Each structure stands twice: as structure tokens, then as C-alpha cells.
Amino acid sequence: MSYRLNAVTIHVNSAKEYKREMKEIWRDITNGKLPILFDSEHNFQQGISPIYQYSNYAQNDFDLSVMGVASEFFKQMELKVIEGFYKKYDFSDTNGDMELCSQKAWEQVKADCISGLIERAYICDYESNVPPEYTKDGKAHCYLYISVK
């Protein structure tokens, strides 16, 4: 009998810890130790995309989950953007650098907060990083869904 985890969650105390922990989690996901993209028998799960969920914010602390979601998740998030519960950010890179896309997206969120363009709700935020081979334009993309007031 095979199984698949929907998510794995860790509590993060700092940005430095976050980066180190994420590398370890991704290594465990890609090698199948944490069956999110693969089931427990190492079979790839078609139609499942990895995303980050940021929640339970408290000063510099937060919970970070890596989740495997189906396309319906993104449809629901787009509806929440239209309803005004989330602001969507989309940053891309022609060289396929997903880390750079993510960095640029988070820098824009910070700038928008400082300028007053958005007021974050700090409820639950999502990040999806997509490699160029899975996008229509052949660029790496970072999509952020930031909860707003």
C-alpha cells in the first residue's frame, strides 16, 4: 500500500534557519524520503505541484509548509485574488533562476508594504516556483499569493 503526504511543516525562527531547513526538506522531497511529489513507493504523482505555505506568523517566527497541490488550488487562489483577500505577484527570469525570481517577488512585497500599496494580513501566504520547462514562456516564475487586509 502506497501513501503520499499532503504537506510537511516546520517552525522557523529566522531567515538563516529558513534557508538551511528548506534545502534539507527539498533534498528529502526530491529523493522521495518525504513522499509529497512521489508516493511512498517512489512513483511520481502526476498533476501535483509543490508550493510553500507561510503561516502562524509571530514576530520573526512562522510555520513553513511544503505542500503538494493540484491545479484546483491555483484556481481557488485566483478567485481569492479577485475577491481581494490576496494580492498576486508574478516575477520571472529568462535564465531560469527560480531563487532570483523569489527574491525579486519578496522584495516587491516589502516595497509595497513600505509604500502603503498593500497591508499584509499575515494569515497565510503561498509561494509557487516554476522551472522554465513547465511554463508557456520558457522563463522561470515565482508566484506569490500574499494575504492582505
Question: Can you describe what each PLM-predicted range is?
Answer:
Residues 1-149:
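A solvent-exposed interaction/effector surface
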